[in-house]
């Protein structure tokens, strides 16, 4: 487990979160990549943040859980960058992503946020 991963996410919750990212990508708005995700979190625009567990060097995403907690934005760890990239509609992996407007995934995002809060 990476240094920045501070709780384990069950596989079913990870799958639900990635599905919500796909729906938000199609019906709402998502930010892809560490820089865009960081900006969305710092501005308080993010509804749910995704961080890959396989990022190297770890310093690339190490700050995200801390600033998300500071801004009271839920975040979830996902196994690989490829999982996030695929769900966000990219042909390549992405170390991080954020749902800015959940669109039709609004209910799912709220459920995921509650479950993540219980895990932390």
Swiss-Prot record:
Keywords tagged on the record: Cytoplasm, Ribonucleoprotein, Ribosomal protein, RNA-binding, rRNA-binding, tRNA processing
Molecular function per GO: ribonuclease P activity; rRNA binding; structural constituent of ribosome
Alphabetized InterPro entries for the sequence: eL8/uL1-like, Ribosomal_eL30-like_sf, Ribosomal_eL8/eL30/eS12/Gad45, Ribosomal_eL8/Nhp2, Ribosomal_eL8_arc
Any one Gene Ontology cellular component term annotated for this protein: ribonucleoprotein complex
Record-linked Pfam families: Ribosomal_L7Ae
Protein's cellular compartments: Cytoplasm
GO BP terms, alphabetized: translation; tRNA 5'-leader removal
Superkingdom in the source lineage: Archaea
Function: Multifunctional RNA-binding protein that recognizes the K-turn motif in ribosomal RNA, the RNA component of RNase P, box H/ACA, box C/D and box C'/D' sRNAs.
Protein family per UniProt: Belongs to the eukaryotic ribosomal protein eL8 family.
UniProt cross-references to HAMAP family, sorted A to Z: Ribosomal_eL8 (MF_00326)
Subunit and interaction comment: Part of the 50S ribosomal subunit. Probably part of the RNase P complex.
Protein name: Large ribosomal subunit protein eL8
Taxonomic source organism: Natronomonas pharaonis (strain ATCC 35678 / DSM 2160 / CIP 103997 / JCM 8858 / NBRC 14720 / NCIMB 2260 / Gabara)
Source taxonomy: Archaea, Methanobacteriati, Methanobacteriota, Stenosarchaea group, Halobacteria
């Amino acid at each position: 487990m990476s240094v920045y991963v501070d709780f384990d996410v069950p596989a079913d919750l990870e799958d639900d979160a990635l599905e919500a990212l796909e729906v938000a990508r199609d019906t709402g708005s998502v930010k892809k990549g560490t820089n865009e995700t960081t900006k969305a979190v710092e501005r308080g625009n993010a509804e749910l943040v995704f961080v890959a567990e396989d990022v190297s060097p770890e310093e690339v995403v190490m700050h995200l859980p801390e600033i998300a907690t500071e801004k009271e934005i839920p975040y979830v760890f996902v196994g690989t960058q490829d999982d996030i990239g695929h769900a966000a509609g990219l042909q390549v992996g992405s170390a991080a992503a954020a749902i800015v407007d959940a669109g039709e995934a609004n209910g799912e995002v709220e459920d995921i946020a509650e479950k993540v809060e219980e895990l932390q």
